């Protein structure tokens, strides 16, 4: 017979359906259309399964039933979890009048929840049938209460006597959201069907009787109702109801759509664990329930496993193991370490597709005590399969099952070796749980075997399923087993037929032994008794124990005869022992050591590896006594008692020991003397060397080779500063637009003033002083510089005012008016500024377009030194511990290994150029910052901007090489972009560039600065610090503020440590400058090196005041141009003439020599030393960005709130949960910010920036 391992639920008893106590639940079958294994007992099998059952946890399969079969045991069924199959029956009616719902958790042929097939009389089509004979077969469905099929369709075919299947409104029965709802039925009948009863509305019925009218609960409902009890809008059922209801509440449902919780329909069962929001603890929920099928139960039924998630299951999930409690309940428990290996049977894991035990898989069960799965022995097991190369199973191979104690599935045997008279290879099998049932019904099946007895003497439990034993013509002892004691629920039973009659067994003496209690046994002999009437010795029943006579002597414990210890002396008139241990003897057979009987006294025996050996001897009474001498080693000489003899030392041994000791002492003395002498020689040599060096030194040593940092820091008075307008505010303090009026001078200098808030922590003051130290030491026209510092109670940094804001906002605002010359000039200037920082050994770490300020449309400066770090003279790289960093601008080694070098700044420079060429687009927009490292390692880079030629884009790509040494140096970038700036339209292609306006001279932020009337009559900060009076005019008044700009522009820009630099620009009242004229400072990047070298004809027409900033730096700090450039980056003759470059035909007349002394230039290799009084954080990083008590790190990026311009100390609402837009620091989890009362402008936090203190 073909075998299929079907996983089915066992027989159960639990509370399930709404409003009913003691609802009986039973399992279904899974045989489909196969013939029953035992047709003789098939009806009995169904009766045992469904007698009194109300909920079928599985499939209801009614097949191959005769015409006279009594099916009254089906009348209580109300719910079927799987599908319902009525096929190949000859009965006229199936009494399922109470069936309400078919859930369709399993479907027949994967489509149908209800299948009625071939229920006909074999003589139905025979024309010679006897007249007046009523054909057999199903005549009516009579499913009068069926109002819901949740999933699956209907299949009705081959039922010639069946009526009314087409009178049913199946649309009302099938659920609206039922995706698999085909209705496939034929109406071919061999008889005429009466009409439905007149009381049936719309002529819908299940049978001829008025009680069989169809109850409609779906199609008659008003809009929005899934089920209802009537046509009125108030008749709607609760949304958790299925099959209809008696009222609107979820306790009025006829069946539950999801789960039934004590008569109330719920979407989920109550969780076992709840969260207490008051105590922040997880607590046991006293109302928690386990999920079992469509019901909520307090405990899982027997033979089911409870899980931590609150479900009842048959198989534990991965990384869990079965645990049986003392009360017999079973649960799945998570393994604290890798779960121990288990033995899997058929239907599980790698044996899921195996049909039977064969010679190929039997060795997997060697040594197994518990098998998770089933065992099946088919004829092919012992015949083999030559086509697949499987050898026949030999009988001796079955000995591997002698250690087996438990099977979680079923045991099926339809073939067995003829030489075996029983199943004694399973003599130690105690439990067959039946979590997996054969045909969905049987946990033990024995059929067609030649055995004479069962031999399962240790079997004590069949946890679920029926036992089927039939067609075993030689088998006796079937009825001598107390099967009721093995079963665990009332639906279990033994089905047997075709076995050897008991009378024939009795005639041959195949009966239970007389020592078997109640005549219960598994086979002949005293070893096959279920229980013994007298005593049990091992596995054998005996009349008495060997307490007084016989060897070995025994003692009695209950009804078990247990042997005494072998060292116990047998007694004739009393018990020999009262236990099985050596210290439980009445007398010893040999010797007694303490309280235990021993065969011999311990002689040199170590009771434990860590103890000394013990020596004992027996006295006259046989009691072990300790020896006078306890030898520990070399115990060779023993006396007559077996104790160690006294050892006398030999003179040779003494002499050898003395000589060896003396030699060792002499060697140690010599070694110590040598070491002392060498130590004195080294001290003498070092002393002489030091004295010689002290006499020969004539000048101080400079081991590092670093030149002193002679940068100057201006200390300003608070009375010299005048604050006009708030530019930004944050957690650390406020940035103001202001004026610096030096004492004793009639000048006004526009500045940006950063003021720390009150009660600033000492660490915050130290960090801002560190930033001031870095800014004060720079000296490049392309790097923002510090003007001074005011040491009031709240430290104030004073920086240059920049009128156009940051470069990022500038290119976004004027993207339609920027030319290729503008973009390339900015690239050159940024590269020169970074090249200068490389020379002074300063790693910027935060280069981006937002950190480049625009002094004029032709002049930009690098700023934001909040993350910048100086390298010592012997350092080439910097390793950071954490803090805020811009992930999308950083090199890969900086993200992964926190390694920052000048070459990592080259990577950031490439991203900055990309921002310019895309007019302020966001790099890697839409990609989370956490994915950036993997994206870069896979080779992905930013795409080529539309306006860039391949020449410009290849420079960007070189900046983004994984190997930092393969990236270009900044001096090389200066050279490359300077070459491109001479022919800009060849390398940057902008549509309609020639038709567009000139470079923008105005900005939104510039106009905002014009609102203040006090900004007139001002002097540029750089002109004041490095005056060039008398260069073009001997009149010193030209250097004053009288001829300075009358109207000014300013913008606020984010600066790394709180720096905000602003500058000046002529107003619209002044006449327009020549395109060749520089604007405040270094001017356009067409000026390379000394800005006073190489003056063209256009420069000669400028006023002395306009050209004075050009003479501020005597030498370009990055890379001097070759002589033939004459100090300019001019376009080639074939190129159009853009702004800011000299005309090709204009040649410089004569070089101009600055009359004033140029500012000191730091030589190459010079470094900016850290001040000894300032102690940065780890590795020089000042990473406590929350030290100021808030979450906004750099308020310069924040626009001031409306209405705060007139307030010197604005206090807008500030949420500490927000941070700077471009950075995200994860160090906040390690140290919380101190309480702060300061309120600043909120900004959104950008999650695309991560801290480096957590691996990316």
Swiss-Prot record:
Residues with PTM Phosphothreonine: 1167
Major localization listed first in the record, in broad terms: membrane
Keyword Cell inner membrane found: no
EC class of the enzyme, as a word: transferase
Glycosylation sites: 68, 125, 188, 260, 531, 572, 630
Segments of this protein annotated with the region Interaction with PIK3C2B: 1196-1198
Superkingdom of the organism of origin: Eukaryota
GO molecular function: ATP binding; coreceptor activity; ErbB-3 class receptor binding; growth factor binding; identical protein binding; protein heterodimerization activity; protein tyrosine kinase activity; receptor tyrosine kinase binding
GO BP terms: cell surface receptor protein tyrosine kinase signaling pathway; cell surface receptor signaling pathway; cellular response to epidermal growth factor stimulus; cellular response to growth factor stimulus; ERBB2-EGFR signaling pathway; ERBB2-ERBB3 signaling pathway; ERBB2-ERBB4 signaling pathway; heart development
Binding site for ATP: 727-735, 754
Extracellular side: 23-653
Disulfide bond entries: 26-53, 163-193, 196-205, 200-213, 221-228, 225-236, 237-245, 241-253, 256-265, 269-296, 300-312, 316-332, 335-339, 343-368, 476-505, 512-521, 516-529, 532-541, 545-561, 564-577, 568-585, 588-597, 601-624, 627-635, 631-643
Function: Protein tyrosine kinase that is part of several cell surface receptor complexes, but that apparently needs a coreceptor for ligand binding. Essential component of a neuregulin-receptor complex, although neuregulins do not interact with it alone. GP30 is a potential ligand for this receptor. Regulates outgrowth and stabilization of peripheral microtubules (MTs). Upon ERBB2 activation, the MEMO1-RHOA-DIAPH1 signaling pathway elicits the phosphorylation and thus the inhibition of GSK3B at cell membrane. In the nucleus is involved in transcriptional regulation. Associates with the 5'-TCAAATTC-3' sequence in the PTGS2/COX-2 promoter and activates its transcription. Implicated in transcriptional activation of CDKN1A; the function involves STAT3 and SRC. Involved in the transcription of rRNA genes by RNA Pol I and enhances protein synthesis and cell growth.
Protein name as it appears in the record: Receptor tyrosine-protein kinase erbB-2
Annotated organism of origin: Mus musculus
């Amino acid at each position: 017979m073909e075998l299929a391992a079907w996983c089915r639920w066992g027989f159960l008893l639990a509370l399930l359906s709404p409003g009913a106590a003691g609802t009986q639940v039973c399992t279904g079958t899974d045989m489909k259309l196969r013939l029953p294994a035992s047709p003789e007992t098939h009806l009995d099998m169904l009766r045992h399964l469904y007698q009194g059952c109300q909920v079928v946890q599985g499939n209801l399969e009614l097949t191959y039933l005769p015409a006279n079969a009594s099916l009254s045991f089906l009348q209580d069924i109300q719910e079927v979890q799987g599908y319902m199959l009525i096929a190949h029956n000859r009965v006229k009616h199936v009494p399922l009048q109470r069936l309400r719902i078919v859930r369709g958790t399993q479907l027949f042929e994967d489509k149908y929840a209800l299948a009625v097939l071939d229920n006909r009389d074999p003589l139905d089509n025979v024309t010679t049938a006897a007249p007046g004979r009523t054909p057999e077969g199903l005549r009516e469905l009579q499913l009068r209460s069926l109002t819901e099929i949740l999933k699956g369709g209907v299949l009705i075919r081959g039922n010639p006597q069946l009526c009314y299947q087409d009178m049913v409104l199946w649309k009302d029965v099938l659920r609206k959201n039922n995706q698999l709802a085909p209705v496939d039925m034929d109406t071919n009948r061999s008889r005429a069907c009466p009409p439905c009863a007149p009381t049936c509305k719309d002529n819908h019925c299940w049978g001829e009787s008025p009680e069989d009218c169809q109850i409609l609960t779906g199609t008659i409902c008003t809009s929005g109702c899934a089920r209802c009890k009537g046509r009125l809008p108030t008749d709607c059922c609760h949304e958790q109801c299925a099959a209809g209801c008696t009222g609107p509440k979820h306790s009025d449902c006829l069946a539950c759509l999801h789960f039934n919780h004590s008569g109330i329909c719920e979407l989920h069962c109550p969780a076992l664990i709840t969260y207490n929001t008051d105590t922040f603890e997880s607590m046991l929920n006293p109302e928690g329930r386990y999920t079992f099928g469509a019901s909520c139960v307090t405990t899982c039924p027997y033979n089911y496993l409870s899980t931590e998630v609150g479900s009842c299951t048959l198989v534990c999930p991965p990384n869990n193991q079965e645990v049986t409690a003392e009360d017999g309940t079973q649960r799945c428990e998570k393994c604290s370490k890798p779960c121990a290996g288990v033995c899997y049977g058929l239907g599980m894991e790698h044996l899921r597709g195996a049909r039977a035990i064969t010679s190929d898989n039997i060795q997997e069960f060697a040594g197994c005590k518990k098998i998770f799965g089933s065992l099946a022995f088919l004829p092919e097991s012992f015949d083999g399969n030559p086509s697949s190369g499987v050898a026949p199973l030999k009988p001796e191979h079955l000995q591997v099952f002698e250690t087996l104690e438990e099977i979680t599935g079923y045991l099926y045997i339809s073939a067995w070796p003829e030489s075996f008279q029983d199943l004694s290879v399973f003599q130690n099998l105690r439990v067959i749980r039946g979590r997996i049932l054969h045909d969905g019904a049987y946990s033990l099946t024995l059929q067609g075997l030649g055995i004479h007895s069962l031999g399962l003497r240790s079997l004590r439990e069949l946890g679920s399923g029926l036992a089927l034993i039939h067609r075993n013509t030689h088998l006796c002892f079937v009825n001598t087993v107390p099967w009721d004691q093995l079963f665990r629920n009332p639906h279990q039973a033994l089905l047997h037929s075709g076995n050897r009659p008991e009378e024939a067994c009795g005639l041959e003496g195949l009966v239970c032994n007389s020592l078997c209690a109640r005549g219960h046994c598994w086979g002949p002999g005293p070893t096959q008794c279920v229980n013994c009437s007298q005593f049990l010795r091992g596995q054998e029943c005996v009349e008495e124990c060997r307490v007084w006579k016989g060897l070995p002597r025994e003692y009695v414990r209950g009804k078990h005869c247990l042997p005494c210890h072998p060292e116990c002396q047998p007694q004739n008139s009393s018990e020999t022992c009262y236990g099985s241990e050596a210290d439980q003897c009445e007398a010893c057979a040999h010797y007694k050591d303490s309280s235990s009987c021993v065969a011999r006294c311990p002689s040199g025996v170590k009771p434990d590896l860590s103890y000394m050996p013990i020596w004992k001897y027996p006295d006259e009474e046989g009691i072990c006594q300790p020896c006078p001498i306890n030898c520990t080693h070399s115990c060779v000489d023993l006396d007559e008692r077996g104790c160690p003899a006294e050892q006398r030392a030999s003179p040779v041994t003494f002499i050898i020991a003395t000589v060896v000791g003396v030699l060792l002492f002499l060697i140690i003395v010599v070694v110590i003397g040598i070491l002392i002498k060498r130590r004195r020689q080294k001290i003498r040599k070092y002393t002489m060397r030091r004295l010689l060096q002290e006499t020969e030194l004539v000048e101080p040593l400079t081991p590092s080779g670093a030149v002193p940092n002679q940068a100057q820091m201006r200390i300003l008075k608070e009375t010299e500063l005048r604050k006009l307008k708030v530019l930004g505010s944050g957690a650390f303090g406020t940035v103001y637009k202001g004026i610096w009026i030096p004492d004793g001078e009639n000048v006004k200098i526009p500045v940006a003033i950063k003021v720390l808030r009150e009660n600033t922590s000492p660490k915050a003051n130290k960090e801002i002083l560190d930033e001031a130290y870095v800014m004060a030491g720079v000296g490049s026209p392309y790097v923002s510089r510090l003007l001074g510092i005011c040491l009031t109670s709240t430290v104030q940094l004073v920086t240059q005012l920049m009128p156009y804001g940051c470069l990022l906002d500038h290119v976004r605002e004027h993207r339609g008016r920027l030319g290729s010359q503008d973009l390339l000039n900015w690239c050159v200037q940024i590269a020169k500024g970074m090249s200068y920082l490389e020379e002074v050994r300063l790693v910027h770490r935060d280069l981006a377009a937002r950190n480049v300020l625009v002094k004029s449309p032709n002049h930009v400066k690098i700023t934001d030194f909040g993350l910048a770090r100086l390298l010592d003279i012997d350092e080439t790289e910097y390793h950071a511990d954490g803090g805020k960093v811009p992930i999308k601008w950083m090199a890969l080694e900086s993200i992964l290994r926190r390694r920052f070098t000048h070459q990592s700044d080259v990577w950031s420079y490439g991203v900055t150029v990309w921002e310019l060429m895309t007019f302020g687009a966001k790099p890697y927009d839409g990609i989370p910052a956490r994915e950036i490292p993997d994206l870069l390692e896979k080779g992905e880079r930013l795409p080529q901007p539309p306006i860039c030629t391949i020449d410009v884009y290849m420079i960007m790509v070189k900046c983004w090489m994984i190997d930092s040494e393969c990236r270009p140096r900044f001096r090389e970038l200066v050279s490359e972009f300077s070459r491109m700036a001479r022919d800009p339209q060849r390398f940057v292609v902008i549509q309609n560039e020639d038709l567009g306006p000139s470079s923008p001279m105005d900005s939104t932020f510039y106009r905002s600065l014009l609102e203040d009337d006090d900004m007139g009559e001002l002097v540029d900060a750089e002109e004041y610090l490095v005056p060039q009076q008398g260069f073009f005019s001997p009149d010193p008044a030209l250097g004053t503020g009288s001829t300075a700009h009358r109207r000014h522009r300013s913008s606020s820009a984010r600066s790394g440590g709180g720096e905000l630099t602003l500058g000046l620009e002529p107003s619209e009242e002044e006449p327009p400058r020549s395109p060749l004229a520089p604007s405040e400072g270094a001017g356009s990047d067409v000026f390379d090196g000394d800005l006073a070298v190489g003056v063209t004809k256009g420069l000669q027409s400028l006023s002395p005041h306009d050209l004075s900033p050009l003479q501020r730096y005597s030498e370009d700090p990055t890379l001097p141009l070759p002589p033939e450039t004459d100090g300019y980056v001019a376009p080639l003759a074939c190129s159009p003439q853009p702004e800011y470059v000299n005309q090709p035909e204009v040649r410089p007349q004569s070089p101009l020599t600055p009359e004033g002394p140029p500012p000191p230039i730091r030589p190459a290799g010079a470094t900016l030393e850290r001040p000894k009084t300032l102690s940065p954080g780890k590795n020089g990083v000042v990473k406590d960005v929350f030290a100021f008590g808030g979450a906004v790190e750099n308020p310069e990026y924040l626009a001031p709130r409306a209405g705060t311009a007139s307030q010197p100390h604005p206090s807008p609402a500030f949420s500490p949960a927000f941070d700077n837009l471009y950075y995200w620091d994860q160090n906040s989890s390690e140290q919380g910010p101190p309480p702060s009362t300061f309120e600043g402008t909120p900004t959104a936090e950008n999650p695309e920036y991560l801290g480096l203190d957590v691996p990316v």
